[in-house]
């Protein structure tokens, strides 16, 4: 195996390890996102499909990982009911790359939240009567809140990705240079 590939693998392992560490610190470790973090190192191919020199690293995670990492801007607005009626929603997703569109939360978001609520064993209650509410109602209430307030960016993946480039740039460059020297001396 080439020194360059070894250096790329070292970088990729660092990014995954640090990303998982960040998720654990944010009390989101052990879940689907944590388990889905992975990488794959591939050798470059030319137009004809033949292998060429150099390698690429691809990182994989659950689709919603990008939203957790980079944040989502909420639509804002004012609260219509409850004790905080008339107060504006605080937008947690400031600086987020993504944003919710006007309207209501989509069904896939509500369905995902419903699954999460059941997995966590969360039981919602009606504020006035104290009665339990259905999981569907609770998931809609949470989805509506997230839709208005957004998702705060965590940069759990972006920070290690950038830090890894800074940390391993010399190792990767030296390994690539050594591989070139080895090829020229053959």
Placement of each model-derived feature along the sequence:
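Charge-rich, low-complexity N-terminal segments
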Residues: 1-49
């Amino acid at each position: 195996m080439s020194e360059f590939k070894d250096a790329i693998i070292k970088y990729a392992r660092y990014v995954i390890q640090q990303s998982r560490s960040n998720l654990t610190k944010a009390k989101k470790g052990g879940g689907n996102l944590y388990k889905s973090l992975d990488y794959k190192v591939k050798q470059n191919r030319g137009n004809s499909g033949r292998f060429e020199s150099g390698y690429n690293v691809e990182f994989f995670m659950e689709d919603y990982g990008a939203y957790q990492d980079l944040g989502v801007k909420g639509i804002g607005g004012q609260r219509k009911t409850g004790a905080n009626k008339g107060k504006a929603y605080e937008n947690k997703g400031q600086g987020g790359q993504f944003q919710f569109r006007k309207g209501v939360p989509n069904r896939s978001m509500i369905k995902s939240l419903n699954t999460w609520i059941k997995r966590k064993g969360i039981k919602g209650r009606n504020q006035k009567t104290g009665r339990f509410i259905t999981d569907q109602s609770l998931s809609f209430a949470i989805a509506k809140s997230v839709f208005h307030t957004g998702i705060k960016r965590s940069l759990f993946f972006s920070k290690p990705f950038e830090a890894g480039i800074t940390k391993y740039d010399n190792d990767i460059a030296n390994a690539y240079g050594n591989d070139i020297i080895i090829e020229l001396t053959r």
